[in-house]
Amino acid sequence: MKPNTDFMLIADGAKVLTQGNLTEHCAIEVSDGIICGLKSTISAEWTADKPHYRLTSGTLVAGFIDTQVNGGGGLMFNHVPTLETLRLMMQAHRQFGTTAMLPTVITDDIEVMQAAADAVAEAIDCQVPGIIGIHFEGPHLSVAKRGCHPPAHLRGITEREWLLYLRQDLGVRLITLAPESVTPEQIKRLVASGAIISLGHSNADGETVLKAIEAGASGFTHLYNGMSALTSREPGMVGAAFASENTYCGIILDGQHVHPISALAAWRAKGTEHLMLVTDAMSPLGSDQTEFQFFDGKVVREGMTLRDQHGSLAGSVLDMASAVRYAATELNLGLSNAVQMATRTPAEFIQRPQLGDIAEGKQADWVWLDDDQRVLAVWIAGELLYQAEQARFA
């Protein structure tokens, strides 16, 4: 058992967002990192013989789940696919409320993909807090919609990729692909193995996208970006995403990738239950890095934007707490909707029912936010792993 994972948390003046509802004056009991009880009243007897935290302000919410994380802390996962890189990435993102992530390896050589998978398998075996799987974004993508993905590495699925994708020691296996680059039978085989298929970086027409969904694809990667657009006569991937009610869409809410009106349209179409926040963060997140080498070129940071040498957007420096604030305030969706899009919705997409909410039986992954929705403290599996300087427990 990890240290400090048996305790009580007392919300005495703070709010707790549980199952979509804000409540005050409650107590949460944790045993071995799992929530074993929620009480609507507070008694001094409960804390007499058990360690406890007392929150008198702010809001406690479930930990944020980011399904698309390319780097952080000054390192790209593709460039240094090691266990130590994963630890550093998780540390960089954790201060912004991320308690679970899928490290993302973008289009590259098979050797890089294999090294990334080995690092994730090692992290899971070592129980590195927050590393729950891997996201392969490419290399089975459209040349026309590749974005910053290197064209020389785009390819179909070979036997070497099959051996990688069918591994059972990687936790969550999320694969982004363009439906025109594979067959429905290949999608069916991947889904049957337990992989989750997301569609993206694609110039496919609506019919091709719907066939991929029928084959088992269940998500869309960074909605609007790198995909065929919705028009009056051709729905494209965006239209197919809106029309398929049981699929999930990731969206980058940094004010750069998606116009706020487009973001609201996506929310109207998909709802809080099927629109999820992602960062697509690159190495500068959580560091003072202003530029970095990216394959044969360079990516430069300009404020909150990253662009490659061709002027294309190249990931982001967005963090999950900022994405939640943007959804809650800029889009006026409110805290409850914004948090669900960062917690319960991605948990359902990646089929991890133990994550994504503050409820009995769930893992004690929490974020304590102040009244401006800034992160004060972070717990993963009941272990306090981040505490801001201004955070004070009563």
UniProtKB/Swiss-Prot annotation:
Swiss-Prot/TrEMBL catalytic activity: N-acetyl-D-galactosamine 6-phosphate + H2O = D-galactosamine 6-phosphate + acetate; N-acetyl-D-glucosamine 6-phosphate + H2O = D-glucosamine 6-phosphate + acetate
GO CC field: cytoplasm
Short name of one Pfam family: Amidohydro_1
Top-level taxon in the UniProt lineage: Bacteria
Database matches in Gene3D superfamilies: Metal-dependent hydrolases, Urease, subunit C, domain 1
Amino acids binding substrate: C148, H149, N225, G226, R233, D254, G255, Q256, H257, L313, A314, G315
Primary location class: cytoplasm
UniProt keyword Metal-binding present: yes
Enzyme Commission number(s) from the entry: 3.5.1.-, 3.5.1.25
Residues of the active site: D280
Enzyme category, top tier: hydrolase
Family (UniProt): Belongs to the metallo-dependent hydrolases superfamily. NagA family.
Function: Involved in the pathway of N-acetyl-D-galactosamine degradation. Catalyzes the conversion of N-acetyl-D-galactosamine 6-phosphate to D-galactosamine 6-phosphate and acetate. It can also catalyze the conversion of N-acetyl-D-glucosamine 6-phosphate.
PANTHER family hit by this protein: N-ACETYLGLUCOSAMINE-6-PHOSPHATE DEACETYLASE
Name recorded for this polypeptide: N-acetylgalactosamine-6-phosphate deacetylase
Biological source species: Shewanella sp. (strain ANA-3)
Gene name in the database record: agaAII
